[in-house]
Amino acid sequence: DPGSSFNPLMTIAENVAEPLLVHHKYGSVADAKNYVGDLLEMVQLPRAYMNRFPHELSGGQRQRASLARGLALKPSLLIADEPTSALDVSVQAKVLELFKRLQAEIGFACLFITHDLAVVDMLADRIMVMHKGQIVEHGDADQIMQHPENPYTKKLLASLPVPDPREQQQHRAHLHELLAQEA
């Protein structure tokens, strides 16, 4: 939940400005106000939201405000741990599109931690698959998604739902074959 990382007693402006103040980039929230407003607009939130409190924002809005705070110090690497898991699918898609656009515009690298393979397929250039705390496969995203080598990765990808019923039936048969090989 992106809201859990915000201080509920502070406005969105104060929350977004906090890393800027801690790292002495600005002397006060008032000094950082224009930059915070720019950050909010960058993540598609109106400047007026600076005066709101976290509980006044929807989940998607809190996620975008959290992204603004994460980008405040202009990082070269952003670590995003399950950033869309608490959001409904339509909001997820908007946040992911925003994320892709900002990554292209600003040029930061991202370590995106997720269990959602549709998100991985949409965002990743490179993939690392973990099973029981161990890395079992890593490489180019297209290679891993289209031609996985590790048995766990194969089962993981075979378990994904497919919109086409005929293709889904083939997908399930392949998953059952993989599971039978394991037995």
Predicted regions and their residues:
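A short, surface-exposed alpha-helical micro-motif characterized by mixed small hydrophobic
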Residues: V120-M122
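Conserved ABC ATPase signature
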Residues: F53-L57, Q61
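Hydrophobic anchor residue at the start of the ABC signature
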Residues: V16, L67, V95
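A short, proline-enriched helix->beta-strand linker immediately N-terminal to the Walker B motif
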Residues: A72-S76
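ABC ATPase "signature
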Residues: H138-G139, H147
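Conserved ABC ATPase "signature" region
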Residues: A30-A48, L157-A158
